UniProtKB/Swiss-Prot annotation:
Species of origin: Hemachatus haemachatus (Rinkhals)
Alphabetical UniProt keywords: Cardiotoxin, Cytolysis, Disulfide bond, Hemolysis, Hypotensive agent, Secreted, Toxin
PROSITE patterns per UniProt: SNAKE_TOXIN
Extra remark: Is classified as a P-type cytotoxin, since a proline residue stands at position 31 (Pro-31 in standard classification).
Keyword field contains Transit peptide: no
Name under which the protein is recorded: Three-finger hemachatoxin
Function of the molecule: This protein lyses red blood cells and has cardiotoxic and hypotensive activities.
Organism ancestry: Eukaryota, Metazoa, Chordata, Craniata, Vertebrata
Coiled coil: none
Gene3D superfamilies in alphabetical order: CD59 (2.10.60.10)
Expressed in which tissues: Expressed by the venom gland.
Chief place where the protein resides: secreted
Domain of life: Eukaryota
Amino acid sequence: LKCHNKLVPFLSKTCPEGKNLCYKMTLMKMPKIPIKRGCTDACPKSSLLVKVVCCNKDKCN
């Protein structure tokens, strides 16, 4: 699986073994602007301020 791991969408990395989800964190007030991206083994929960989206296809975040 390859996930974007920087704020610019054209940079990606291959996820390590066991981390088979990509995630993207955005601020609830500014959903178009990612604040963090990367690989994860379990999808982090969204909070009042931060929305988290997870997916399992290459570069889907």
